[in-house]
Amino acid sequence: MMARPWNFSAGPSALPEAVLQQAAAEMLDWHGSGMSVMEMSHRGKHFVQICDEAEADLRELLGLPADYAVMFMQGGGLGENAIVPMNLMGRRSTPAADFVVTGHWSTRSHKEAGRYGDAQIAASAAEATEIDGQAQSSWTWLPPVDTWRVRKDSAYLHLCSNETIGGVEFTEWPDPASLGAPDVPLVVDVSSHFLSRPLDIARAGLVFAGAQKNAGPAGVTVVIARRDLLGHALPICPSAFDYANVAADHSRYNTPPTFAIYVMGLVFKWIKAHGGVRGMEEANRAKAELLYGYLDGSAFYRNPVQPAVRSRMNVPFVLRDESLNDAFLQGAEAAGLMQLKGHKSVGGMRASIYNAMPLAGVQALIDYLKEFERRHG
C-alpha cells in the first residue's frame, strides 16, 4: 500500500485513517449481518441502530439537551441556505431574516434567503477597514457585535461562524438578548469548524453543518434545532425538508444518505476516543499556532486575516511573488502535500487543517514552506 499523502482539502476533506480502515473492513459484512450498510433498508433494524447510535454519540459529544432535535439531512450547507428560511421565516407574519455577512458563504446565505422573504444585512465585513492601526481588506475581519443592527421582528439572525474561504472565525456567539432582539433566534452555519472546539449551541436556535469537513463524508448535513422552532414551515417548503417531519421520523422521513451517516457515526466514535471535542480543540490549537507562527515570521508568505479572528481550521496564505504559485503547488504535490490551492474567488493558497490532520502533517507543510522559501526567496 502506498504512503498516504497529507490532504489539506477544504472539503470533502481527509477522514481519520482508522475510520477508513474500519469502513473498509465492514464494507461487505456489517457486524455479521451479511450486508453492506449501503444495502440496508433505512427502516430496517440494522440501520436504525446505526442512525440512532450516531445521534446518541453526537448528543454526548456536544452535551445537547433534550429540547434540541438532531437531524441528518441531505442538500449540504448550500441546501440549508434555502431549507432554513423555508422552515423559519413562517414564524413571522411577514417573512424576514437578518444576516451578518462576513465572507463568501454568509453572502450566499443572505442571497438565497432573499428568495423566500425580506433578507437584510445586520452587519458586514465587505469593506476594507482599519483595526488597531492596521489596514484590513474586505472579508479579513469581523464586524464588532455592538455594530450589528437586528430587527426585533426578524424570524432569525444568521451568521457563518467559520468562513472556509476567507479564514475568519467567530470564537463566541452573541446572546440575541444583548442585541436588543431577545425573540430572534440565532442560526449558525458551523460547517467548517463543527466538532473542532466546544460551541455554545444553547445560545443558538439552530446550527447546521455539512459533514464533509470535520464530521464525515459528503452527502449528509447535520441540523440541530430547538424544538420550539419546528412546525413553522412556509407552504412552499417540500415535505422532505420540513424540519418537523424529519425530526418526528428520526432522520428517516425519506431515504437518508445511509452510508454517509454510518461513516459519520464512526467519526463521532473516533472523536470520543481521542478526548472528545475538548481533545480536538487542544490538538487544533497546537496545529494552528504552529502554522500561523511560521507564516507570521516569514517575509516570503503572508496571511491576510486580522490575527484576533483567524480560523484554526482554514489558513489562507499568499506568496509575496505570485508568479511562483504554480511552481509552489507542483512542488507541494511532489512532496505529498495535496490540495493547497486557494479558492478560485480569492486565489493564493489555503491549508485546511481539520480534526483528522495530525500535527505531523502541519509540520511537513512547514518543512516544505521553509525549503521552497530557501530556494526561491
From Swiss-Prot:
Pathway: Amino-acid biosynthesis; L-serine biosynthesis; L-serine from 3-phospho-D-glycerate: step 2/3; Cofactor biosynthesis; pyridoxine 5'-phosphate biosynthesis; pyridoxine 5'-phosphate from D-erythrose 4-phosphate: step 3/5. The modification N6-(pyridoxal phosphate)lysine is found at residue 213. It is an enzyme of class 2 (transferase). Its cofactor is pyridoxal 5'-phosphate. L-glutamate binds at residue 43. It catalyses: O-phospho-L-serine + 2-oxoglutarate = 3-phosphooxypyruvate + L-glutamate; 4-(phosphooxy)-L-threonine + 2-oxoglutarate = (R)-3-hydroxy-2-oxo-4-phosphooxybutanoate + L-glutamate. Pfam families: Aminotran_5. It is found in: Cytoplasm. Pyridoxal 5'-phosphate binds at residues 105, 164, 189, 212, 254-255. Binds 1 pyridoxal phosphate per subunit. InterPro entries: Aminotrans_V_dom (IPR000192), Pser_aminoTfrase (IPR022278), PyrdxlP-dep_Trfase (IPR015424), PyrdxlP-dep_Trfase_major (IPR015421), PyrdxlP-dep_Trfase_small (IPR015422). Its main location: cytoplasm. One of its GO terms (molecular function) is pyridoxal phosphate binding. GO terms for biological process: L-serine biosynthetic process; pyridoxine biosynthetic process. One of its GO terms (cellular component) is cytoplasm. Its EC number is 2.6.1.52. Keywords: Amino-acid biosynthesis, Aminotransferase, Cytoplasm, Pyridoxal phosphate, Pyridoxine biosynthesis, Serine biosynthesis, Transferase. Belongs to the class-V pyridoxal-phosphate-dependent aminotransferase family. SerC subfamily. Catalyzes the reversible conversion of 3-phosphohydroxypyruvate to phosphoserine and of 3-hydroxy-2-oxo-4-phosphonooxybutanoate to phosphohydroxythreonine. Homodimer. This is Phosphoserine aminotransferase. It comes from Bordetella parapertussis (strain 12822 / ATCC BAA-587 / NCTC 13253).
